[in-house]
Amino acid sequence: MIRNARRTDIPRLKEIRDSVRENRLRDPSRVTAEDYCWFVDNPGIFVWEEKGGIVGFSAADPRNGNIWALFVDEAHEGRGIAQALFERACTVLLSAGCPRLWLTTSPGTRAERFYRRAGWRVTGSRAGELVFER
């Protein structure tokens, strides 16, 4: 089930994000609690919850059309959770009137393959990451 994230969810969101091996931002000092709080306070961060536990989340920034995060606990991959969270994030951005939806991810990762399969296209690079747009 998808629901809006709450501040009390932040420790679990950080845990999920930090557990993804292919994540360049695994260093906890690079993504702060304040970053998460902004998304909780400004609708755009959603969690997938099962049996009382969070297994994935997405975050979208309506200020600039950016998908800031999409992470699923590895034990729950391959079940459509990422796709559902991704669609929710895109809906938030489109509803906010964002003319450009974009994100960055490292090349050669599962995330890159996911975004390509979703029909997003690479439009450049930024700080060693691919820039995808829809």
Residue ranges and their predicted role:
Residues 64, 100, 127-129:
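A generic structural signal for beta-strand entry/edge sites
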Residues 93-106:
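Conserved GNAT acetyl-CoA-binding A-motif
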Residues 132-134:
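Short beta-strand-to-coil "C-cap" segments at the C-terminal boundary of structured domains/repeats
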Residues 73-79, 107:
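Active-site acidic-Proline motif in GNAT/NAT acetyltransferases
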Residues 83, 107-124, 128-130:
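Conserved active-site alpha-helix within GNAT-family acetyltransferase domains
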Residues 4-75, 86-87, 92:
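Acetyl-CoA-dependent GNAT
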